[in-house]
Structures are given as structure tokens and as C-alpha cells.
Amino acid sequence: VEDSPHGLLAASRSRANVLRVDNPKDLTLEKITNKLNENKSMNIPKWQGGKMNVLIPMAGAGSRFQQAGYTFPKPLIDVEGKPMIQVVVDNLNIEATYIYVVQKEHRAKYNLDTLLNLITPNCKIVEVDGLTEGAACTTLLAKEFIDSDAPLLMANSDQFLEWDSNEFMYKMIEQKVDGGILSFHSTHPKWSFAKVDEFGYVTEVQEKNPISDIATVGVYYWAKGSDYVKYAEQMIDKNIRTNNEFYVCPVYNEAIADCKKIKTFNINKMWGLGTPEDLKYYLENYKK
């Protein structure tokens, strides 16, 4: 709570939420909550930390939406006037080279090259024809673009996060980690999970097995994309699967065994957009 001009200016420059009231008695919980909800849509500067790659696989079948009568593929479903993939990219809020893995049949039919380049100019597009043996295999289709010393961020194409990408990236660089996992608190076995030691370093990750209450969001950072490629290929060579698929999160176990430093970064909330029910819940509740 601040009413001096200097204090208000400092609060604004620090990107604090500022609520002006005429009288201290007017400072109610309802007004604070409403102001915070309004500020969810404020423009936060994009993270601009130099050369970086963001990889978004968007080649899933989206069968739940098809069964519910949706005619467009999931990444193109309208979410408050924007294709879902644009909502996801805007929410990541990171200046980078974007790389998308798309279904071959969708690329031409829906003019994905034009659309994705409008959302993220000069992006890279990789085709997949049909299904792979898991998300890790899908991401490696983009190996030619990510197998380098440039940082890599991988994200799901069907979720919305309440987070600050600047804060996350600053933390990753400040702590000089080799990898970072966005997380939230849950014990539901539909998620992936991370276990950490007393210093906050990840000691183990498990897919669909709640080894802790630190659930992973589905956004994964690697200080070097080449590390991800190396350890993903190593995991696949060892045939380490979950439910007969190669997942992305367990790749960190290979890095941890190689003495790489991995940390988690907790966010306020993750909103799923990946099913008709999740999308409906988001649209009805996010800005309430």
C-alpha cells in the first residue's frame, strides 16, 4: 500500500500491482482480487536473453476434440479469438527462434506455414507423418535445429501458465543450472514428478508416479539444446519407456546420472487446454 508519488513510481517500475484508493477503508479484499485479475492481461516485456530455441510439438491427434465435434485440429481451436497455439506462444512470452513439429496432413490443409510465421516470424517447421513412439521421439525430429549450445525450452501446445518467463530465465541463469523444470503442487498420478534434495536440486523424475508433490508443468529448459539431444537419444537407446512410450521428462534422469544440475521452478497455476472439458473450465474461470 503506497500513496506517495515516489512510492507509486517505484512500484510501477518494479512491475508491482498498484491499486489506487481514496481512503484506506476502501482497500478491501474484493478490490484487491479484482485488480489482480485485471492485471493478468497486462503486457509483460518478453524475455530477450540472446539466441534461444523454443520447441513446441503440436502434432497430437486431438481425438477428444474431434469426438466433441470440433472440426479444426487442436492447435487451431479458437480460444477467445485466437488459435490455441497463439495463446500458448503469447503466454510463453519469450523472444526466440520457434520450432514447431506439425502433422504433415495439417501443414498444407490449414496453411500452417503462413499462420505460424505470422505468430512467430522466421520460425522452423518440422513435419511428422502419423504418430511416433512418444514425445521424446517427436522432439528429436527437430534435432537439426536444437542440437547446439543454444538454450532450449520445450513446451506443450495446449496449456496456459500463470507465470513470469523473465523471472524463470533469470533464475536459471543466476543459478547456473544445466536444466530447469517448471512445476506446481499436485499428487495426481496423471502428471510427471520431480524429487529434490535439501539444496533444491532434482535427484530424480518419474512419469505418472507421484514420488513427491512437485508435479511438472510440461515446460522443460536445457541450458544447451545439445545436452537434451544427447540424453534423449541415450534414454531411447536404453529403451526406457513409460506405458510403452518415450517421454520428455525422464530424459532428466540421464542428465542427473551424469552429474548435471537440474532445478525446479514453481509457478502459481497451470490451466490445461488439452481437452474440451479443460478448455471450457479455463474459459469460464480464468478471469473470474
PLM feature spans:
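A short, conserved beta-strand element in the Rossmann-like catalytic core
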Residues: P5, H106, Q159-E162
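Conserved core of the sugar-phosphate nucleotidyltransferase
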Residues: E162-N239
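Conserved alpha/beta core of the MobA/IspD/sugar-nucleotide pyrophosphorylase nucleotidyltransferase superfamily
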Residues: G50-V54, T203, A215-K288
